[in-house]
Amino acid sequence: MKILVADDSRVMRQIVIRTLRQAGYDDHEIVEAEDGADALAKVSSESPDLVLSDWNMPNMTGIELLRALRGAGNGIEFGFVTSEGSDDMQEVAQNAGARFVIVKPFTPEAFEAALAPVLG
């Protein structure tokens, strides 16, 4: 399995990757993207099984990325890892096709609970 982690903060990408490993997903290949536009290109070139995206990023936000993927007919598994945790934002994310929203600060247990139904 391959997971694409999209966040404009390199440090946050590393924290997400470390937390994935702590949650038991250390055998998955990880690909990084520095913003939504980079993630959109890497979905095509890397064919990940899951995208974990921040909400607020330059060039293309996480929700714009998700809408672009769905608009192109791409049903890739998609979830947000973000500090934007309002009920309205979560509703927008789910209506656009996100499977889950993990709110920062997060724990390995939060990742495991969100990812287990998606990755098995």
Each model region followed by its residue ranges:
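Acidic catalytic/metal-coordinating carboxylates
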Residues: 35, 61-67
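C-terminal output helix
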Residues: 88, 106-115
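Alpha4 helix (beta4-alpha4-beta5 surface) of REC/receiver domains from two-component response regulators
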Residues: 64, 85-100
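Two-component/phosphorelay signaling modules centered on CheY-like receiver
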Residues: 10-31
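Acidic, metal-coordinating helix/loop segments flanking the phosphotransfer/catalytic sites
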Residues: 32-50, 71
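A Lys-centered signature of the CheY-like receiver
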Residues: 8, 104
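Receiver (REC) domain active-site loop signature in two-component systems and cognate sites
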Residues: 57
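Active-site residues of response regulator receiver
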Residues: 54, 82
